[in-house]
């Protein structure tokens, strides 16, 4: 049996500075990222509830965004805090986290 599609799963995402149920997280079809594949992201591993080199990832996310001329409205500290809270909220120990 196939796993449930990502849009139809229980869970949470951190979006626009707040936690949103995964099923309610929506991105507008006319967003720049959809039309031009303009996005930056970091793929991060968490072990025992701790993201490996979380701050390095958050700072690199900011640097990547700057290269493409994007502004990120959240400081690296806020992004780190949100990632940590999300892992706890989801009850994950070992996980893959993608900040974008």
What kind of feature is each model-predicted range?
Residues 1-100:
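Conserved alpha/beta cores of soluble small-molecule-handling proteins
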